Amino acid sequence: MKSYFRPEIDALAGYTAGEQPKIANLIKLNTNENPYPPSQAVQDALRSFDIDRLRRYPDPFADELRDIFAADANVKRENVIVGNGSDDLLTMCFRAFTSPDHPVAVFEPSYSLYPVLAAMQGAEVIKVKLDSCKFTYPADGAQQAARANMLVITRPNAPTGTLCPKDLVRQYCREFDGIVLIDEAYGDFAADNCMDLVKEFDNVIVMRTFSKSCSMAGVRLGYAVSNPIIIEGLMKLKDSYNVDMLSQIVGKANYLDKEYRAKCIDAIKRDRDDLSNALQNIGFEIPESHANFLFAAPPDGDGESCFRYLRENAVLVRYFKGDITGRYIRITIGTPEENARVLELLNARYA
């Protein structure tokens, strides 16, 4: 059959999302979801919701959420755009700033969706390599990315969990003559963030998601903060009603319960560090994680074998093929009971 697709789409491999298994009694630690439920405020908001409202369209701009996010970032509503998950906002940015004549630069390894979005635009991807052992960032990163129109920094990085020092991020923003997109999907698990750089530099976009620290991966909600001119341009690219009514309502309820969210984050960070120390004691190589997961190389350096062993024992983690990433598995931090089971299995195999 004749193909009606653009050549870029025909050649596209597509993004491989983390497996969402239907198997009962499987410990699922492969997609960096929060092990704890959303705030009770979400259930209360759903109980009080008037279902008759669903016959109406939602606020196309999610202005109530924009005001809440703006207040937290100490900016104005005009500095904020809300999306159907941060992937929606990433898609807008790639549509806005990349093309066959406008390359994008990404650090390698990082989020595997970026090259897919670039390919959809027919854009070249300039890969700036991280150190292959500790996954540290090069001081000349902006120079390596100089031909690009957009530089993407995942902070903390996925899948490694490492953190580009804020002073180095600031240096990149100052030296790079293009858009600097800082993807802070895991930012709440780190010691600091880059939201204030939006006011320091006109070329910076900082992006957040509700899928990790907010326990709402199933809702699909995210937001980005930048200067008003960039936000105005991105507004032209969004779907007309890109954030549904229920997402806006439960997103607000959940986000405002900051005390509960902070307790969940603290528990995850504590368990992350405990599991990291325990695995290193039996020979795992783990770069310091600032996220809600560990990037862990087993003592024999065979990440795929370790992944399969855990899967055979009803624990699902993530494995990424590759010369560097293939040595590792990525383990989402789960409940204390789930983490204990992971440690029990890995102790049995490697200790």
Locate predicted features:
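Conserved PLP-binding catalytic core of the aspartate aminotransferase-like
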Residues: 269, 281-313
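PLP-dependent aspartate aminotransferase-fold enzymes
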Residues: 79, 95-133
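Active-site phosphate-binding strand-loop segment of PLP-dependent enzymes
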Residues: 126, 130-188
